[in-house]
Amino acid sequence: MSVKWEKTGKTSGELTFEISQEEVKKGLDQAFKRVKKNLRVPGFRKGHVSRVVFDQFYGEEALYEDALNIVLPEAYAAAVKEAGIDPVGQPQITPVSMDKNKPWEMKATVSVKPEVKLGDYKGIEVPKQSTRVLVKDVDAELNKRREQNAELVLKDGKAAKGDTVTIDYTGTIDGKPFDGGSAQNYSLELGSGTFIPGFEDQLIGHKAGDDVDVVVTFPEDYGAKDLAGKEAHFATKIHEVKSKELPKLDDEFAKDVDDSVESLDELKDKIKKDLKKHKEEDAKDAIQDAAIKGAVENATIDEVPQAMIDEDVQNQLNQYLGNMQRQGIDPQTYFKLTGTTEAQLREQLAKGAAERVKTNLVLEAIVAKEKLDASADEIKQEIKDLAHDYNMDEKVVRRSLSDDMLKHDIAIRKAIDLVADKAKQVAKKATKKSTAKKSTKEDEKKADK
């Protein structure tokens, strides 16, 4: 095969290659077989036309387009391999010559991955992460659980922030009702931020039996575009006011909220361990993010092809919509309810695409330099993990992912771990504001001693 690669830019070039006469003949034969069954030629039964008759009646050139579609993918892949390039995105391939007595000549305009020159990626300084669990952290979690298990009791007085009111409301704009603007016997916790800004605040200070004219303005960025920025009046009737009655913090409470413990002390110990685990996970993520960011900043990367950015956005979009569908959410219904569009989501995903592409390029360069790979056992475990995460059969996962894809993902994770493990944690520089603060003795006590 005759192959020529000529760079036209840092990340682009033209690939000229030939498709041999032998391959062209195979493509023409396959193309004829595909069209033969539907051919109608005077004097012949449908599907019983010979190749000679076809060429006389239609001309061999009538098969060229189908034949090219058949042989081109394999020929292009072979040319890419021989040229030693790493293309991204879809090439634009144009026939230069398609003579039946000569090899077909093609020219492809191709985007390629940019060159990456690694800088320092070991020993990168990252902010030191604390995994201490303080008494106040445990207390905050206990209070959260008390809130979650609170009972609502009728209240005679005025509604306050944190109380729950049962209301009827009818909304109008310019005196006319609008879709979704009315409800009966709706339970609303004041201060929860469930309704648009200002609605809940105007119910505070009122009691059961009161009629309240709530006047609010929908935010300019409100999901329903027909309501955004408009003033609305809600005729609101308060039926009842309830306040939260928090459960007593004792052994019985502990057993009620967690059947694996027998006392409040056991619950506190368990909360400490859980918080410790979460803080360690958060610290690991923070170190990884900071270390990888440093490695990317230290690297030199040629311009990133738009094709790579477009591909990243499409992959992110596919993943986002796929997760929606796995959760039983129809994407079109989601867009309708949120007042957004797929184009807006794509635009949002595009904001971080260039940085994501650069990060992946640097990690791939580290994989190559460190000669990171994946063993057969690691690939098997990866398939098991993916099947578990997505609730799929292992065989289905295996069929949908190639070894190269699995090896790539595993090697990238190894590169992330390498950069993070070699990072140096350094104390965060104290600001005037932070040094001026005085910690209480309670906060100084570690709950994980």
Swiss-Prot record:
InterPro entries: PPIase_dom_sf, PPIase_FKBP_dom, Trig_fac, Trigger_fac_C, Trigger_fac_C_sf, Trigger_fac_ribosome-bd_bac, Trigger_fac_ribosome-bd_sf, Trigger_fact/SurA_dom_sf
Compositionally biased spans, kind Basic and acidic residues: 439-449
Reaction catalysis annotation: [protein]-peptidylproline (omega=180) = [protein]-peptidylproline (omega=0)
Listed PROSITE patterns: FKBP_PPIASE
Disulphide bridges: none
Subcellular locations according to the entry: Cytoplasm
Highest taxon of source: Bacteria
Gene Ontology biological process terms, A to Z: 'de novo' cotranslational protein folding; cell division; chaperone-mediated protein folding; protein transport; protein unfolding
Alphabetical keyword list: Cell cycle, Cell division, Chaperone, Cytoplasm, Isomerase, Rotamase
GO molecular function terms attached to this record: peptidyl-prolyl cis-trans isomerase activity; protein folding chaperone; ribosome binding
Main localization of the protein described in the UniProt heading: cytoplasm
UniProt key word Chaperone: yes
GO cellular component, one term: cytoplasm
Skewed-composition ranges (Basic residues): 427-438
Domain PPIase FKBP-type, chain residue ranges per copy: 162-247
Region (Disordered): 427-449
Pfam families (UniProt xref): FKBP_C, Trigger_C, Trigger_N
EC number: 5.2.1.8
Protein family: Belongs to the FKBP-type PPIase family. Tig subfamily.
NCBIfam families linked to this entry: tig (TIGR00115)
Function (record text): Involved in protein export. Acts as a chaperone by maintaining the newly synthesized protein in an open conformation. Functions as a peptidyl-prolyl cis-trans isomerase.
Domain-level remarks: Consists of 3 domains; the N-terminus binds the ribosome, the middle domain has PPIase activity, while the C-terminus has intrinsic chaperone activity on its own.
Protein name: Trigger factor
Species: Lactobacillus gasseri (strain ATCC 33323 / DSM 20243 / BCRC 14619 / CIP 102991 / JCM 1131 / KCTC 3163 / NCIMB 11718 / NCTC 13722 / AM63)
Taxonomic classification: Bacteria, Bacillati, Bacillota, Bacilli, Lactobacillales
